[in-house]
Amino acid sequence: MSRTYQTLGIVVKGMAFGESDRLVTIFSPEYGLIRAIAPGARKPKSSLRGRTELFVVNQFLLFAGKSLDRINQAETQYSYPGLGQNVCNLAAGQYLIELILALGTEASAQTSLYELFTEHLRRLETEATVENIYGHLAQALFHCLGAEGIAPQFHHCAITAQTISPNFYDRQWRVGFSPELGGIVDLRSSRDMGPIPQMRRLTAMELSLLQQLNQPALPDPQQYLPVIARKNFRLWDWVKAENLMRYYAQRQLGKSFRAAVLLDSMWEVDF
């Protein structure tokens, strides 16, 4: 059986290896995460030099080794050049890479996750602005977690399974959110259970935004919010939605996202 194989993949991690090689992690729809050596990739004239940088999508020809595979050829398909033109978008892209490294598995197909990851990179490159970048990230987190079956539930109570809709007519209205229970909680039903650790309280605006994350594209709040709520929407509400998704993802995956902290500091300066 041949130990040479081909796959489409995107470079999600890279580091120096030996005198002139590069050790890269490739995310492939067919094989998940692949760790491979790019021989001579750090030499100035190497054809693999630019093709093994982060975010570069290649058609790879690889040789399967015992512990590390080896890149024989790489033909670039796309490289998301727009991400590098804005430091916030670049940090956001690196944030999604950290998510994929946490969700990805070796030697198993993850086609849906790959397609969502590359689609959300495209949106960061072409659609994201300083005003909506946190909304795009919140939706990317939701979609990617959903591809692996661990997205939070924002429409039904995690205890009673009853549908919960945001109440914009009562300013004091709140709904709970518990990472341990996997979603939102009707505060009235939670009284019978006693204290729920790490539970947060969400406003009607926050719940409304979170309930829209399952849509294919990022919705415009001014298009779906009731009239009474439209004037109260602020860009900061998308930040809070992303922060909740980040909090949930980090608890589910047991990892923190360093690029997200970097994005926070740069976004505050830009905005």
Curated annotation (Swiss-Prot):
Q: State the superkingdom.
A: Bacteria
* The keyword DNA damage is assigned to this record: yes
Q: Does the keyword DNA damage apply?
A: yes
Q: Which Pfam family, any one of them, does this sequence belong to?
A: RecO_C
The region annotated as signal peptide is none
Which biological processes are named by the entry's GO terms? DNA recombination; double-strand break repair
Q: Which UniProt keywords apply?
A: DNA damage, DNA recombination, DNA repair
The entry's function note states: Involved in DNA repair and RecF pathway recombination.
Family affiliation: Belongs to the RecO family.
Indicate what this protein is called per its UniProt record.
DNA repair protein RecO
